[in-house]
């Protein structure tokens, strides 16, 4: 949105219409993009506009959603200007016309030179002397590929390091994960790679996968028909908004009872129940309680005690006999061992978690006590960052899934043990070359590596122990900058030698591939401009594995390219360098990147997985990805197809609604494997901070801000709301600190310090806080510890610190609301 407007131009009937999946959260709401000449607009009569709606009279409620933020004016490379409108699709089964505060701003985030996206990277940029200068792709690749080659030729590929996206949505997609992955793993063959939100190359669901159950195993429709929905370490209203509003709440308020009767004839059904596991009373809990307070249970556990909670519940339901005995006997292994290891009485469970025994019993009865005629309840367990980033990710998932398997709450409609997700998904890559989980941040901190590429991510804001990472990266980067600044008149080849020599003295050459010059630009020497959906064709899948094609409808700014084509440029430059030297083995390694479009990359990766003659490919589409084509995906529109694809019938892809309905699991023996998960308390580094500091520093997202605020930092709507990352405090704690709403406070511990804006909230427990995660101004990751579990997954949620008042900024107090965010505002 280039400027504020109080009217919205309607698209004419001949406007171009394309499909778009929301760029942001994992729900992947369906939208339509309308594009037409700037100096034209449609009429108010239904036959005069592309929406087919009659604006000559008052429209019925929710007939459509139109706001100025859903419109923009874009300019093509030939100078032609067009209006665009991006609005939610009522026919999409995901959102049914609902928009979120994130997706509803997509049009404004499309590039316009006079809009909020004016700071987009348009050309490769090279740090020369003391300033950033635009350069050509040829020059940028001569430096980037030249340094890569020099390091490879010296024989230590581990010195070439990456931090990269592994997901779908605006910052990823099947085309781009394949392009980047093929470059890193097949061509360069470096093992020193980390993923965007964790400091190694790993899964966030190792335990569940080892137990035979993938983390996205049901459909959003299952939430409509569940007897009980568990929300564990998850705030779905703010982080999966329209999944919560369009699928969860209708169950809670009884709107889906007729559907349950149709699906489960002869089985007792009724309005749904919800159980939230979260130390904090979130907006999701407030909304659910406003909807049906007597059908909502909040288990406000002590921080980090999830394992104890699930072990206590497992022990109790086994004692009561509320388990699927036949299923356990026929389709699982390891039950007795898990029950023995996880043994915990309700009394001990209550003591550790802080949840009363009565609440624990009620949760167990709601969720696992057989219904009339012995029918097992259909209970869906949804989890996210409270587990993913919790106290020993591996152990928590094991304990939760032990409970789920014992009660057969997977593979039946209305069940599922699923992560709610952050980004959309879109993974297809060659296997990691060694399978190692290298703690890349620590490699950098310890002075290892020569070349670091941050690709579609910003770990300066989002990593654990982020302050230490930034400090060392900046110091090592400066060694290279100092050497480069003295290299006046150097050719690209000479500059590569100078950079390499500087890395031999402790320096680190940094490249950032992104939409914007993020905080990483402070350390970078080279920035490469990427494109996002709309400027390219991109496929992703959402949290129910629903794959869609977001169609290109505009030019990317300047010379920006899709990530897959950036990867191809790097590979082809290296190939040419090795051809010139007559090294056929290296030429072969860097071959296979002859892509002209992102569709070429899609065909080379996603559609080749599991096909005869193809190299090994890890793909979320599996071996039937070959059935997906851009043509079929365009025809499938915003509803797409749920992966894996079973077959194509009459030009339509037939997908998979739910996994494990045949009781065949993803293990060698096809059975679900219980996994012992003892309660071990808090990790030592976390316990040490807890002993020294008063406040638990919980953290997470807010509805209005997407991830690292890479777009939002340029949006006045968001910036004025949150000029600084906020920290919610108990009012009594705030008073004892002499802190008023809107004050600036320092948050600190042994790992770092950061600033935040005080936000007293009556729902916050004493000594608990909640800080906005990953924000551009006030970085919560500065105070997380460097502790990781056996799979190098950090405990982002587990840190303690102190808080002190810094002062007051009067402008904040005049313009920033600190009204309680809960929807039951009293």
UniProtKB/Swiss-Prot annotation:
Signals that turn on the gene: Induced in the presence of arsenite.
Binding site for [3Fe-4S] cluster: 22, 25, 29
Reactions mediated catalytically: 2 oxidized [azurin] + arsenite + H2O = 2 reduced [azurin] + arsenate + 3 H(+)
Cofactor info, note text: Binds 1 [3Fe-4S] cluster per subunit.
Coiled coil: none
Source superkingdom: Bacteria
A GO biological process held by the record: respiratory electron transport chain
Enzyme class: oxidoreductase
Cofactor(s) annotated in UniProt: [3Fe-4S] cluster; Mo-bis(molybdopterin guanine dinucleotide)
InterPro entries: AioA/IdrA_3Fe-4S, AioA/IdrA_lsu, Asp_de-COase-like_dom_sf, MoPterin_dinucl-bd_dom, Mopterin_OxRdtase, Prok_molybdopt-oxidoreductase
UniProt-recorded Gene Ontology molecular function terms: 3 iron, 4 sulfur cluster binding; arsenate reductase (azurin) activity; metal ion binding; molybdopterin cofactor binding; NADH dehydrogenase activity
One Gene Ontology CC term in the entry: oxidoreductase complex
Binding site for substrate: 196, 204, 419, 423
Keywords, sorted A to Z: 3Fe-4S, Iron, Iron-sulfur, Metal-binding, Molybdenum, Oxidoreductase
Known EC number: 1.20.9.1
Residues with site note (Involved in charge transfer): 100
Subunit text: Heterodimer consisting of a large and a small subunit.
Protein purpose: Involved in the detoxification of arsenic. Oxidizes As(III)O3(3-) (arsenite) to the somewhat less toxic As(V)O4(3-) (arsenate).
NCBIfam families per record: arsenite_ox_L
The family this protein is said to belong to: Belongs to the prokaryotic molybdopterin-containing oxidoreductase family.
Name of the protein in its database record: Arsenite oxidase subunit AioA
Gene name linked to the record: aioA
């Amino acid at each position: 949105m280039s400027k504020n407007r109080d009217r919205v131009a309607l698209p004419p009937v001949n406007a171009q219409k394309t499909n778009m999946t929301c760029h942001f959260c994992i729900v992947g709401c369906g939208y339509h993009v309308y594009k037409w000449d700037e100096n034209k607009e449609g009429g108010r009569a239904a036959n005069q506009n592309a929406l087919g709606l009659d604006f000559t009279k008052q429209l019925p409620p929710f007939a459509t959603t139109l706001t100025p933020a859903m419109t923009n004016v874009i300019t093509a490379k030939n100078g032609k200007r067009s209006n665009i409108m991006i609005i939610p699709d009522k026919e999409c089964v995901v959102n049914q016309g609902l928009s979120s505060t994130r997706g509803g701003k997509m049009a404004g985030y499309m590039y316009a030179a006079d809009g909020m996206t004016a700071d987009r990277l348009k050309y490769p940029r090279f740090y020369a002397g003391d300033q950033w200068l635009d350069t050509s792709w040829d020059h940028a690749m001569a430096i980037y590929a030249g340094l890569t080659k020099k390091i490879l030729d010296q024989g230590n590929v581990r010195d070439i390091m990456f931090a990269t996206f592994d997901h779908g949505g605006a910052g990823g997609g099947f085309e781009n994960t394949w392009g980047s992955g093929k470059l890193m793993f097949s061509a360069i063959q470096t093992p020193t790679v980390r993923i965007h939100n964790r400091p190694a190359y790993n899964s966030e669901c190792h335990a569940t996968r080892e137990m035979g159950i993938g983390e996205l195993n049901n459909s959003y429709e299952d939430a409509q028909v569940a007897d009980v929905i568990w929300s564990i370490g998850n705030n779905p209203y703010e982080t999966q908004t329209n999944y919560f509003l369009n699928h969860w709440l209708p169950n809670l308020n009884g709107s889906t009872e007729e559907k349950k009767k149709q699906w489960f004839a002869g089985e007792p059904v009724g309005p749904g129940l919800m159980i939230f596991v979260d130390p904090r009373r979130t907006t999701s809990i407030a909304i659910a309680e406003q909807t049906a307070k007597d059908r909502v249970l909040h288990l406000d556990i002590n921080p980090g005690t999830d394992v104890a909670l699930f072990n206590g519940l497992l022990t109790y339901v086994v004692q009561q006999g509320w388990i699927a005995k036949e299923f356990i006997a026929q389709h699982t292994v390891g039950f007795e061992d898990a029950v023995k290891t996880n043994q915990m009485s309700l009394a001990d469970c209550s003591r550790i978690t802080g949840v009363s025994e009565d609440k624990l019993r009620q949760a167990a009865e709601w969720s696992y006590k057989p219904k009339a005629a012995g029918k097992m309840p259909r209970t869906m367990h949804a989890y996210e960052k409270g587990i993913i980033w919790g106290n020993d990710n591996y152990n928590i998932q094991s304990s939760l899934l032990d409970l789920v398997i014992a009660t057969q709450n997977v593979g039946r409609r209305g069940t599922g043990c699923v992560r709610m997700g952050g980004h959309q998904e879109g993974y297809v890559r060659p296997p990691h070359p060694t399978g190692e989980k290298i703690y890349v941040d620590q490699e950098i901190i310890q002075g290892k590596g020569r070349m670091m590429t941050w690709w579609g991510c910003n770990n300066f804001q989002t990593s654990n122990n982020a302050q230490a990472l930034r400090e060392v990266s900046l110091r090592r980067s400066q060694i290279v900058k100092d050497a480069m600044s003295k290299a006046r008149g150097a050719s690209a080849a000479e500059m590569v030698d100078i950079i390499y020599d500087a890395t031999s003295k402790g320096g680190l050459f940094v490249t950032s591939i992104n939409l914007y010059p993020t905080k990483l630009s402070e350390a970078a020497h080279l920035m490469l401009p990427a494109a996002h959906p709309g400027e390219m064709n991109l496929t992703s899948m959402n949290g129910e594995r629903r794959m869609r094609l977001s169609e290109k409808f505009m030019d990317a700014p300047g010379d920006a390219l899709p990530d897959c084509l950036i990867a191809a440029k790097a590979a082809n430059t290296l190939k040419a360098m090795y051809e010139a030297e007559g090294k056929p083995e290296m030429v072969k390694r860097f071959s296979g990147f002859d892509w002209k479009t992102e569709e070429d990359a899609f065909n080379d990766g996603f559609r080749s997985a599991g096909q005869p003659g193809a190299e090994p490919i890890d793909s979320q589409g599996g071996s039937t990805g070959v059935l997906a084509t851009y043509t079929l995906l365009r025809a499938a529109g915003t509803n797409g197809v749920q992966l894996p694809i079973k077959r194509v019938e009459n030009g339509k892809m037939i997908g998979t609604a739910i996994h494990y309905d045949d009781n065949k699991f993803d293990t060698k023996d096809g059975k679900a494997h219980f996994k012992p998960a003892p309660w071990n308390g808090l990790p030592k580094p976390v316990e040490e901070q807890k002993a020294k500091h008063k406040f638990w520093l919980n953290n997470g997202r807010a509805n209005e801000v997407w991830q690292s605020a890479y777009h939002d930092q340029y949006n006045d709507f968001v910036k004025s709301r949150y000029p600084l990352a906020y920290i919610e405090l108990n009012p009594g704690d705030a008073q004892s600190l002499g802190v008023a709403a809107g004050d600036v406070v320092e948050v600190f511990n042994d790992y770092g310090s950061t600033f935040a804006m005080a936000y007293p909230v009556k729902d916050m427990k004493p000594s608990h806080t909640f800080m906005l995660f990953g924000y551009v101004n006030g970085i919560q990751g500065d105070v997380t510890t460097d502790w990781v579990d056996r799979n190098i997954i950090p405990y982002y949620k587990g840190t303690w610190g102190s808080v002190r008042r810094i002062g007051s900024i009067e402008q904040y107090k005049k313009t920033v609301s600190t009204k309680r965010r809960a929807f039951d505002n009293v």
